């Protein structure tokens, strides 16, 4: 699911690392196009979109934590607006890092964002998600994930959209 602030984040990552957005192998975890996609930011790329259910822009139905591609199979691995819905977000992130040879980035809901995409709230916003929902913080990621494989990385927060953003270069 896309929203304007998250798309602006992806645009900023593309502006910072333009070489990773043309003629690369790209894996997107959580690619179901509900109201927009990051796929359009990539030019002349081999692009694999993965999500837990079928739909527009989903090339493979699978869970991010279970993907078994070889280490460093992709130049870019991304996930936008999914981790807050995934009880296995740590395993998914670690798997994304393992499969990337270069750029990893994600966006997800952080403190202040209302619960969404659950049967309790708006099930059509995330049709394959279950009951789990957790807004994540930079501290959650730092305490649960090993960031040592990145040469450079950064976190940022959009306080209006209540989004947490991360990019890292291996």
Which residue ranges define each predicted feature?
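Conserved phosphate-coordination/catalytic loops
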Residues: 4-8, 83-87, 135
């Amino acid at each position: 699911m896309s929203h304007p602030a998250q798309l602006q984040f992806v645009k900023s990552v593309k502006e910072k690392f333009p070489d990773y957005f043309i003629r690369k192998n790209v894996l997107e975890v959580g690619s179901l196009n509900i109201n927009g996609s990051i796929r359009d930011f990539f030019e002349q790329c081999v692009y694999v979109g993965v999500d837990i259910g079928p739909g527009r822009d989903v090339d493979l139905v699978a869970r991010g934590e279970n993907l078994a591609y070889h280490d460093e199979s992709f130049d870019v691995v991304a996930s936008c607006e999914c981790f807050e819905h995934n009880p296995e977000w740590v395993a998914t992130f670690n798997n994304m890092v393992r499969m990337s040879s270069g750029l990893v980035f994600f966006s997800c809901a952080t403190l202040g964002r209302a619960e969404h995409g659950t049967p309790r709230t708006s099930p059509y916003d995330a049709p394959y998600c279950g009951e789990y929902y957790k807004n994540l913080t930079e501290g959650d990621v730092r305490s649960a994930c090993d960031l040592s494989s990145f040469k450079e990385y950064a976190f940022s927060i959009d306080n209006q959209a209540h989004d947490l953003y991360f990019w890292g270069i291996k």
